[in-house]
A protein has these predicted regions:
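His/Glu-based metal-binding/catalytic segments typifying zinc-dependent metallopeptidases
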Residues: 14, 83-139
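Charge-rich, well-structured scaffold segments of protease-associated domains
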Residues: 1-83, 98, 116, 124, ...
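M16/MPP (pitrilysin/insulinase) zinc-metallopeptidase core fold and M16-derived inactive scaffolds
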Residues: 131-149, 161
Length: 175
């Protein structure tokens, strides 16, 4: 709530995906976080951190048979759980959201429907993101910040989830 860029991004996600888990604040509202107990956290870890939801990667010099044996024994010792639940793809909702706050800068975030995870077009989206606003050599940064001096910071982002994607342009400017 005290970081303008975070506040803008949470407001954008809430407006773009109303009623969807993707539209909820990452950390949750203070009331939910304050109500959590250690038992809640332990239950969450038991339910979510299971072999069915795990990705294991090995890179480097290793004996495949020995590693597989270690992994199979180690994973067999972990409690089982349900696989990842199916989630309906949320509908993207265009909106205008204003959140007045006493900050030294105005944090703007524009968002468009992006490319979901698993879509072949995601690679083109990643490249477009890099060119448009992916760093200090991007078109947005060079033109709007360096040449015109219109923004303190400016960048783009591409976020992909199952069935949904979001492309954003974020900027911090003078009021």
């Amino acid at each position: 709530e005290d970081v303008g860029e975070d506040l803008a991004h949470e407001a954008l996600c809430a407006a773009a995906w109303p009623g969807s888990p993707l539209g909820r604040p990452i950390c949750g509202p203070r009331s939910s976080v304050a109500a959590l107990t250690s038992a809640d956290l332990l239950r969450y870890v038991r339910e979510q951190y299971t072999p069915e939801r795990m990705v294991v990667v090995a890179a480097g010099a290793f004996d495949k048979a020995a590693l597989m044996d270690i992994l199979e024994r180690g994973l067999a010792a972990l409690p089982r759980g349900a696989g990842r639940p199916a989630v309906d793809a949320p509908a993207f909702s265009p909106a205008l959201t204003l959140r007045p706050k006493d900050f030294e800068q105005v944090c703007l975030e524009l968002g468009w429907r992006g490319i979901p995870a698993g879509d072949e077009r995601r690679y083109a989206m990643m490249l477009a993101n890099f060119i448009i606003g992916g760093g200090a050599s991007s078109r947005l940064f060079l033109r709007l910040r360096e040449e015109l001096g219109l923004a303190y910071s400016i960048y783009s982002g591409s976020y992909a989830d199952t069935g949904a994607g979001l492309f954003t342009v974020s900027a911090s400017v003078a009021p």
